[in-house]
Amino acid sequence: MAQSKEQRVHDVFQSIYKKYDVMNSVISLQQHKSWRKDTMKQMDVQAGTSALDVCCGTGDWTLALSEAVGEQGSVIGLDFSENMLAVGREKVAAAKRTNISLVHGNAMALPYDDNTFDYVTIGFGLRNVPDYMQVLQEMCRVAKPGGKIVCLETSQPTIPVFKQLYFFYFKRIMPLAGKVFAKKYEEYSWLQESTLAFPGKDKLRDMFVEAGMKDVTVKSYTGGVCAMHMGIKPI
């Protein structure tokens, strides 16, 4: 019997957690940190606020949000892979952050009340969920009116030659890099599949609007291989 997307993704991340951070740097050619840093700048996170980081993985964005909201603020990182969360807990402990809670949960059914968070983020996780729209609607639901919902995700370049190189890299090079650096060829084959199947930036902008957000901002990075989408929950 074929695995569901949800089960396959869960198995992938339960397997690659030890090398996930290293492979992020390898696959993005060290760019993912600068993409996230600029996204945080665009978000203009205020001290004393609350944030939910959906599909938080090993917690890099969760930690960045924690620093931005400060001691008077609070951040929850949610992920469905216990192994990824275990790495995240080690990072939180090492950073001595007391305003972070890491929670095992499902992005498709967020265990929080409506209108709870000032910021709701998802970084390199939306492409892996079974239903993009359901997750976007859930993120919008738990955001406060006027709150920001932000997705940082791989995208698809539109420049012809660059687009061809991009597809070659993800189809051929990325799985091989996974085999060399993480000994996980099949798992990184899945990640390239999910990347190439993910909607382009214009389609994702439309999905943000359909999910209930307004004033959607889109910013592309590194020739369009990554994009930030930020929407506001109507007041």
Swiss-Prot record:
One of its GO terms (biological process) is menaquinone biosynthetic process. Pathway: Quinol/quinone metabolism; menaquinone biosynthesis; menaquinol from 1,4-dihydroxy-2-naphthoate: step 2/2. Pfam families: Ubie_methyltran (PF01209). InterPro entries: MenG_heptapren, SAM-dependent_MTases_sf, UbiE/COQ5_MeTrFase, UbiE/COQ5_MeTrFase_CS. S-adenosyl-L-methionine binds at residues 58, 79, 106-107. GO terms for molecular function: demethylmenaquinone methyltransferase activity. Its EC number is 2.1.1.163. It catalyses: a 2-demethylmenaquinol + S-adenosyl-L-methionine = a menaquinol + S-adenosyl-L-homocysteine + H(+). Gene3D superfamilies: Vaccinia Virus protein VP39. Keywords: Menaquinone biosynthesis, Methyltransferase, S-adenosyl-L-methionine, Transferase. Belongs to the class I-like SAM-binding methyltransferase superfamily. MenG/UbiE family. Methyltransferase required for the conversion of demethylmenaquinol (DMKH2) to menaquinol (MKH2). This is Demethylmenaquinone methyltransferase. It comes from Shouchella clausii (strain KSM-K16) (Alkalihalobacillus clausii).
